[in-house]
Amino acid sequence: MNEDLIAEIQALSAIGSEEKFSEIIRLLKNSTLELRGKKNPDLQLSASALVFKKHKLFFIEHPYQKELLLPAGHVELGEKPLETAIREFHEETGFSASESGKLVDVNLINIPYNKIKNEKEHQHIDFRFLLELKEKEAGLAELPFFLLDRTEAPDEFKKYYQYKR
């Protein structure tokens, strides 16, 4: 059911974090429910965009968790994670990114209970893509966004600055 996703992760596992990727692959293999489109209340797919502008990475302030995160969102039915990363980056920041990207990481994220949406605690398998900024001027952004250098970024994301060009 999730063979395409597993193949993408297996290509990444050759460059590190084999234990982490093995756990994610196990979850994908054992999942009998659709992971796209929030169909599964326990495990869902998401995708994040890593986009640099002048050596600074884009972050958004998450509306419920009130923390700085990469622009990201749920993978919709019929959508591939790369398409999600591109779409969410545009929606959340108002900027556009290239339609090609490089998968650089996959993470299992524990999502806390959301009392505003009445969503129970669950997990996301988050695909993180390095994208190139296409437009220098932003359109309408859904969320406040920030351009941060490595010293300003949350610790979890500092490792991604190795990809800046």
From Swiss-Prot:
Q: What Enzyme Commission number does this protein have?
A: 3.6.1.-
A Gene Ontology molecular function term of the record: metal ion binding
Q: What pathway does the annotation place this protein in?
A: Cofactor biosynthesis; tetrahydrofolate biosynthesis; 2-amino-4-hydroxy-6-hydroxymethyl-7,8-dihydropteridine diphosphate from 7,8-dihydroneopterin triphosphate: step 1/4
- Sequence motif Nudix box, residues: 73-94
Looking up InterPro entries in the UniProt record yields: NUDIX_hydrolase-like_dom_sf, NUDIX_hydrolase_CS, NUDIX_hydrolase_dom
Keyword Glycosyltransferase (UniProt): no
* Annotated ranges, domain Nudix hydrolase: 42-165
Q: Which Pfam families match?
A: NUDIX (PF00293)
Q: Which cofactor does it need?
A: Mg(2+)
Note the SUPFAM superfamilies from the entry: Nudix
Function, please?
Probably mediates the removal of pyrophosphate from dihydroneopterin triphosphate (DHNTP), a possible step in the pterin branch of the folate synthesis pathway.
Q: Under what name is this protein listed?
A: Probable DHNTP pyrophosphohydrolase
Q: From which source organism is this entry?
A: Lactococcus lactis subsp. lactis (strain IL1403) (Streptococcus lactis)
